[in-house]
Amino acid sequence: MINGLKNYSQDALRAARYIGQGFFVTLDHMNRTPITIQYPYEKLIPSERFRGRIHFEFDKCIACEVCVRVCPINLPVVDWEFQKSMKKKQLKSYSIDFGVCIFCGNCVEFCPTNCLSMTEEYELSSYDRHELNYDQVALGRLPNPASKDPLVHPILGLGYLQKKLLTQSTESKTITNFDKS
């Protein structure tokens, strides 16, 4: 009888401890700032090396087609004609279909004239897939930087990230560049 009562009290204390631990975890999660954002109204600032939409500078392109050769899916469409008078290629048109692009960045990395660059634009969705086929004019437009976008609100107080990450990270502008008000 005494052993049974002793075991019962030990089990009750162990159960209370487990319930207390679970309750402590719940309270800890309730005190944290949520990591999610309200996307259309708040936007994350992409990191410095983010691979977004490709920007193309028509005047720098020499129509060498290196971008087509290094692309895993041979995506960029380069149309050129040979100018006999100048004895070099003349670029006529350049286009990329972002509905097919895998944003690997090989074209940007291997371009000898640096006429291709990655932007921080990530809002490419559309209802018509043909709108994702960008020609040289659409590729030449620079998007507004996300850091200057009035809709971007930095995420404040990501308290459960380690302090080292907040101070050492140069990759994530969202975490390090916030107002301390």
Swiss-Prot record:
It is found in: Plastid, Chloroplast thylakoid membrane. NDH is composed of at least 16 different subunits, 5 of which are encoded in the nucleus. Its main location: plastid. Its EC number is 7.1.1.-. Belongs to the complex I 23 kDa subunit family. One of its GO terms (molecular function) is NADH dehydrogenase (ubiquinone) activity. SUPFAM superfamilies: 4Fe-4S ferredoxins. One of its GO terms (biological process) is photosynthesis, light reaction. Residues 52-81, 92-121 form the 4Fe-4S ferredoxin-type domain. InterPro entries: 4Fe4S_Fe-S-bd, 4Fe4S_Fe_S_CS, NADH_quinone_OxRdtase_chainI, NDHI. Keywords: 4Fe-4S, Chloroplast, Iron, Iron-sulfur, Membrane, Metal-binding, NAD, NADP, Plastid, Plastoquinone, Quinone, Repeat, Thylakoid, Translocase. Its cofactor is [4Fe-4S] cluster. This is NAD(P)H-quinone oxidoreductase subunit I, chloroplastic. The gene is ndhI. [4Fe-4S] cluster 2 binds at residues 71, 101, 104, 107.
